């Protein structure tokens, strides 16, 4: 992303510039730390870098924080801990050597969190080498706390890559970069969601939202009605599957429950006659609706 930014000239009027992607990352983690999709050597990350002027830091960081928590609201995540990771002033050899930069960066992040009324803890010595960061940590049902989301403030790398923009006075200035990962590693994020929901994903997130099950799969009338229902749902962008296997209905229903499909639709002759479907919401009894 640094090289993409450096590929052309930029004015202060262009900033902020936001460059993001879903990236495949590789990291040689020690074998003892590997843990399924929660921590692997290959993972996917929703990675973004935001190029801003110093005056835009607080506003852009505030937008990142809002995006993190609006995303958590969508997924029903309420149990998390915000950590402002700072450098250790007693061990400066670990960090980019610029006291003024560090003080400015840490004060900017701290001010935004205070202005937004967000509770957080400060952890000395946990910053990246190039700047302070906000980590949002969760505690899974099993195992240690880990970071889901992060936003890191970076004054260092833009200078090393010789990135510039032209300010309002026509002078070359170095932008500031915010490293942003809203969901962090997608693999780890899904591991957390699956663990928290025990696989009972909300309907909007379930890979298959509805399974349609005719009582008899060898009856033309029932199968025609089943295809009609599937087509109607598919037209509404519902992720629907037709289970037309030559198995007993009870067996297919049990499999649908084990797969944790949110809605199982059962179609019999009464449903065909009355233009209705019987449905079972995962974990509940059958109900009837008209279509």
Name the predicted role of every residue range.
Residues 1-288:
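NTP/phosphate- and nucleic-acid-binding module
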């Amino acid at each position: 992303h640094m090289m993409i930014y450096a590929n052309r000239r930029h004015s202060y009027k262009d900033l902020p510039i936001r460059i993001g992607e879903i990236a495949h990352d590789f990291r040689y983690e020690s074998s003892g730390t590997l843990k399924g999709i929660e921590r692997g050597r290959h993972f996917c990350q929703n990675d973004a870098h935001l190029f801003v002027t110093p005056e835009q830091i607080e506003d852009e960081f505030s937008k990142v924080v809002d995006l993190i928590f609006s995303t958590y609201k969508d997924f029903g995540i309420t149990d998390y801990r915000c950590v402002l990771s700072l450098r250790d002033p007693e061990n400066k050899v670990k960090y980019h050597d610029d006291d003024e930069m560090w003080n400015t960066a840490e004060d900017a992040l701290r001010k935004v969190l205070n202005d937004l009324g967000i509770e957080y803890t400060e952890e000395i010595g946990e910053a990246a080498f190039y700047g302070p960061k906000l980590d949002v940590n969760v505690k899974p049902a099993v195992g240690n706390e880990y970071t889901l989301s992060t936003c890191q403030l970076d004054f260092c790398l833009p200078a090393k890559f010789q990135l510039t923009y032209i300010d309002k006075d026509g002078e070359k200035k170095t932008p500031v970069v915010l490293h942003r990962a809203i969901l962090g590693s997608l693999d780890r994020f899904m591991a957390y969601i699956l663990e928290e929901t025990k696989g009972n994903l909300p309907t909007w997130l379930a890979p298959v939202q509805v399974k349609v099950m005719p009582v008899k799969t060898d009856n033309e009338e029932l199968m025609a009605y089943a295809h009609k229902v599937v087509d109607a749902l598919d037209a509404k962008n519902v992720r629907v599957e037709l289970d037309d296997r030559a198995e007993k209905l009870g067996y297919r229903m049990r499999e649908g429950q084990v797969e944790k499909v949110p809605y199982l639709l059962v179609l019999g002759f009464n449903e065909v006659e009355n233009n209705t479907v019987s449905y079972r919401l995962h974990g509940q009894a059958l109900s009837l609706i008209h279509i």
